[in-house]
């Protein structure tokens, strides 16, 4: 069994909690409230900054240009097309520039971002890739899950439903598959001596993913 499969098997309960969260389920069936999605989107926009920092440091720590290239391409997507997508989405959600530029990070957003940035500075390239395997792998998994269930939140014809459908469609194999496969290949080369640390990172990142969904769904002060 590969290292990645071992990690997913050992922490399957957490993995499934992240992929099958009620936030995702309601996103797929179109019943997720605008308030909950807006809170998620505002916090995710803040979180992306720390994810980009981690990816940038990963590029610098990569052992070769070949290993760095997929992460660099992922980083370019975050800083380019994805950032533009967020700006357009805020307009759709009725959130103006003053509002989204002045949103404060909620505690879970801050904690998750701090965890990733600290790991980026202190950890190895493989350790960073382990965290990214969670952050990107979970998103690919829930996107594939909703597609397999033929989720169609746009069926009611509402603007919000169409937006939800677009968000689901964005998280697909074409967009996330390359970086997830790259991180999987890096993690699968881990030696036994590295495993305790990788397991800890994988578990912590998953706990933060679940907490992020909880925060988006329930709110936080």
Label each PLM-derived region with a short phrase.
Residues 68-175, 207:
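Active-site-proximal alpha-helical scaffolds that flank and shape metal-associated catalytic sites
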Residues 173-202:
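Long amphipathic all-alpha helical oligomerization modules
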Residues 19, 47-54, 81-85, 108-112, ...:
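Amphipathic, well-ordered alpha-helical segments in soluble domains
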Residues 8-32, 51, 181-189:
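Short alpha-helical hairpin
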Residues 2-3, 7, 115-116, 214:
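Hydrophobic alpha-helical segments
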Residues 3-14, 65-67, 96, 164-167, ...:
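A structure-centric feature marking long, well-folded core domains of fungal metabolic enzymes
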Residues 199-221:
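Acidic, carboxylate-rich catalytic segments that either coordinate divalent cations
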Residues 12-17, 31-61, 81, 130-140, ...:
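Alpha-helical bundle segments that constitute or directly flank the non-heme di-iron/ferroxidase center
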């Amino acid at each position: 069994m590969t290292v990645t499969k071992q990690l997913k098997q050992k922490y399957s309960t957490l993995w499934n909690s992240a992929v099958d969260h009620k936030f995702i389920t309601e996103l797929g069936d179109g019943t997720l409230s605008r308030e909950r999605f807006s809170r998620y989107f505002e916090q995710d926009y803040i979180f992306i900054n720390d994810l980009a920092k981690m990816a940038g440091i990963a590029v610098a720590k990569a052992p070769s240009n070949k290993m760095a290239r997929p992460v660099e391409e992922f980083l370019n997507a975050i800083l380019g097309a994805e950032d533009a997508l967020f700006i357009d989405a805020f307009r759709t959600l009725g959130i103006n520039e003053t509002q989204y530029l002045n949103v404060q990070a909620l505690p879970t957003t801050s904690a998750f971002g701090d965890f990733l940035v600290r790991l980026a500075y202190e950890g190895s390239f493989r350790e960073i890739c382990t965290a990214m395997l969670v952050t990107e792998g979970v998103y690919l998994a829930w996107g594939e899950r909703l597609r397999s269930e033929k989720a169609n939140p746009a069926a009611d014809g509402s603007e919000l439903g169409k937006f939800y459908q677009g968000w689901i469609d964005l998280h697909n194999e074409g967009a996330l598959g390359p970086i997830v496969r790259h991180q999987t290949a890096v993690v699968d080369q881990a030696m036994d001596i590295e495993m305790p640390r990788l397991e800890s990172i994988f578990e912590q990142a998953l706990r933060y993913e679940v907490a992020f969904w909880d925060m988006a769904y329930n709110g936080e002060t």
